[in-house]
Amino acid sequence: STPRLEGFSMPPEWAPHECTWMEFPPANKEFAADPAELAAARATWASVANTIARFEPVRMVCNLGESHISRELLDPAIELFETTTGDAWCRDSGPTFLTHPDGRLGATLWTFNAWGDRGFSDPTDERHVGVFIAGLAGAEVFPSSMVNEGGGIHVDGQGTVICTETVQLEIGRAHV
């Protein structure tokens, strides 16, 4: 079955939601080339998370064994969850949440290939993060064979989809 056939749809950005999900930057090729760069990335992520936490709950996924690092930088109200991670772009590799008129939560799990397997990070470390987050959120899971980055699509809740050409159509990135 598909989310649409089951009555689910992707809500617009401004729709009410329970919380914001984020991933804390792990040491990987993108962030850890220089310890100062990794520290700066972590401080930036923490600043964003701490700002969001002033207005709504934040749930942060941290790489296994690294929650103590994020805890030092994050507001105590931010919930931490540990699992193996490979990157910090939860919007791209995490679930795309869906809503149902009866209040149920769903999640599309795209096939994530780390931006076309360009070597920024190992996509195998990220592919389970969507399942992990969807499980914690209690969402009904809809796996998709479509290679996609969740951050590459936006909807208005009225049937309009805005997508990025580089994500959806770039050969190698989207395996078109």
Spans of model-derived segments:
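The feature marks the mature, well-folded catalytic cores of soluble enzymes
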Residues: 1-173
